[in-house]
Amino acid sequence: MARMVQCIKLNKEAEGLDFPPLPGELGKKIWQSVSKEAWAGWLKHQTMLINENRLNMADARARQYLLKQTEKYFFGEGADQAQGYVPPQS
């Protein structure tokens, strides 16, 4: 049976992640309160941030930036948007 969590991002009960996606306290916090669906949304957003900002993941500053954005995306006021990005109309 799948592990269910009350997803902090989607505000509903949904299937939880199989394991903490990051090391440390942030990974544990995400594992406890973020669903697979919300994590998949973050991965898409993270990819957009990496591409649009031309982040070099070998650079420690870029990795720190993404960790801060991860925390803001789930537990803060929301992550940065890529400059010039316009969300599709639904």
From Swiss-Prot:
Any single Gene Ontology cellular-component annotation: cytosol
Keyword Iron: yes
Keyword Iron applies: yes
Keywords: Iron
A GO molecular-function annotation: iron ion binding
Any single GO BP term: cellular response to oxidative stress
Pfam family, one: Iron_traffic
Family: Belongs to the Fe(2+)-trafficking protein family.
Function of the molecule: Could be a mediator in iron transactions between iron acquisition and iron-requiring processes, such as synthesis and/or repair of Fe-S clusters in biosynthetic enzymes.
Record PANTHER family: FE(2+)-TRAFFICKING PROTEIN-RELATED
Name of the protein in question: Probable Fe(2+)-trafficking protein
Organism: Cupriavidus necator (strain ATCC 17699 / DSM 428 / KCTC 22496 / NCIMB 10442 / H16 / Stanier 337)
